[in-house]
């Protein structure tokens, strides 16, 4: 469980913002959303493979020389 210590005379909004930031850095919300519903192992492999292919094409496209602009 993530905890933060509220400093003396610290507004609630600031403490809440700090809490949200720590949760975001730890990646708890993304993990929680991913585990919200059961995903079959084949569907998980398929999703990860598609993401890897997309990353690969993006990396290849960024390494290519730009087309001539004339």
UniProtKB/Swiss-Prot annotation:
Keywords: Ribonucleoprotein, Ribosomal protein. The keyword Ribonucleoprotein applies. GO terms for cellular component: ribonucleoprotein complex; ribosome. It comes from the Bacteria. InterPro entries: Ribosomal_bS21, Ribosomal_bS21_CS, Ribosomal_bS21_sf. The keyword Translocase does not apply. PANTHER family: MITOCHONDRIAL 28S RIBOSOMAL PROTEIN S21, SMALL RIBOSOMAL SUBUNIT PROTEIN BS21. Belongs to the bacterial ribosomal protein bS21 family. This is Small ribosomal subunit protein bS21. It comes from Acidovorax ebreus (strain TPSY).
